[in-house]
Amino acid sequence: MSEPECVGRASDKEVLHRFGYAQQLLRDMGGFSNFAISFSIISILTGAVTLYGVGLNAGGPVVMGAGWPLVTFFVLFVAAAMAELASAIPTSGALYHWASFLGGPAWGWLTAWLNLIGLVAAIAGIDYGCAQFLTPLLGLPETPANFTVVFGVLLLSHAVLNHIGIRTVARLNDLSAWYHAAGVAIVVLALAFFAPKQPVAYLFTKTFTTVTEKPYWFAFLGGLLQAQWTYTGYDASAHTIEETKNARVSAPWGIYLSVAISGFFGYLMLAFVTLAVKDLGATSAAANPFIYIFEQGLGSTFGRVVLWIVTLAMWFCGLSCVTSTSRMIFAFARDRGMPLSARWAHVSKRWRTPAAAVWLAAALSFFLPCLILGLVALFPRRLDFSRLYPAVTGISTIGLYLSYGIPLLLKLRAIRRGVWTERANGPWNLGNWSVPVNVVAVIWIAFITVLFVLPPNELTGSVFAGTLVVLLAFYFLCVRGRFRGPVRQAKSQEDLLMLEQELDK
């Protein structure tokens, strides 16, 4: 616990040195850019749109009117608890480092892999969803082969941009934040002025479900996946903390505000979209209920415009997610936590980016949908493709939130044992509210983890349980005793400065 307790008023680089790491990545992101990367990954124009049908079919308009604010309320507790830890332990390893310092290398290793699985599944879900939107817009037949090719091109564009530097990506993330706000404004204003509207009570009283074998309240809870998956990836502000100026303050605000502002804009958009529903049965049966609402209310031309707006938002979202995932891979490999760690921890001297980690993130993300398509082809009678996209998003949600929850639970244990004190906190902290906020956050994470593996999400549960068994077996058979958690890159500050000078040559 000594590392988190010694940061004081030191500069960003001095703090990083005290954790034993050199300033290898270019620290050029401002506070807004740090916020923008998490805001872009949350991307209300991605998660809320691609899973709109899931929420609508599960519980109807009430899922939008009551479900979204319910999830937002509890996710704000999670974000605040994570922000506090980011301020205390400001390294790119983020969740993995927090868990390691608080619980030891075993907890850190498990957290790292859960976070990596969640992030890779998130990239796959985002970019494959984007490919499904973009393919018909390009006039191509909507076949799995075409989806996969377009998906690969999207991933390639994200990898190239992340390879060539954080400055380019930061500017695009800044643009993405304003683009999302403008996109929501266009959607809301168009519906407010030109589309027919249901009464406001429709959002809170109109129930609907296609889950006939379960009681309505159970179906409603299942519909929360729409909002909960949208609120993933905001740990990106922590993963890019070594590239952020005034990191111990800017990154925590980036985590918290990305959730709060997304919650406001997301609710505004979902409310107006849902109030524009004409025929609930026809809308729920549509291939894309979100776009169907626009086509019915404003015509096919505007529906196509909205489709382009959403598709570009997904592209921005995928770009930011590759950035976050590559930083997580870099930090974990830097501590020798992955196979071929030396390769994945490589930093490009020219661009000062974790280039190898960028391409690994893209490759793993491309592999996942290809694996799913292969399974569908092999077992067409047992696997329904329509259930696989929610399964991927469910895996992403559970993996990420378990990786969020482990360090928060370990922190509560450390506080109870007297190991973590106020002295360990960074400048952004919750004071006396820290314990209750962390308790609520952990309870919520436990609740959604159980919820999203119950029927009709048993496919998610099966895949995730199998993955967890493999991870634990691999740890106890191959890793235990060898992996020691965060590793100092050098013994002295002079050696760290020499590492930094090597990159400047």
Tell me the role of every PLM-derived stretch.
Residues 54-64, 136-147, 166-177, 287-288, ...:
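Transmembrane helix-loop boundary segments of multi-pass membrane transporters
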Residues 49-57, 66-67, 76-155, 159-163, ...:
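Hydrophobic transmembrane alpha-helices that form the core helical bundles
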Residues 22-26, 53-54, 84, 96, ...:
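Helix-loop junctions at the membrane interface of multi-pass solute transporters
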Residues 64-65, 139-146, 175-304:
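Helix-loop-helix junctions that connect adjacent transmembrane segments
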Residues 1-29, 408-437, 456-505:
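Terminal cytosolic tails of multi-pass membrane transporters
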Residues 97, 104, 135-140, 210, ...:
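TM-loop-TM module centered on a large, flexible mid-protein loop between adjacent transmembrane helices
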Residues 146-198, 203-204, 232, 254-260, ...:
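Membrane-interface loop-to-helix entry segments
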Residues 31-50, 364-368, 444:
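The first (N-terminal) embedded transmembrane alpha-helix
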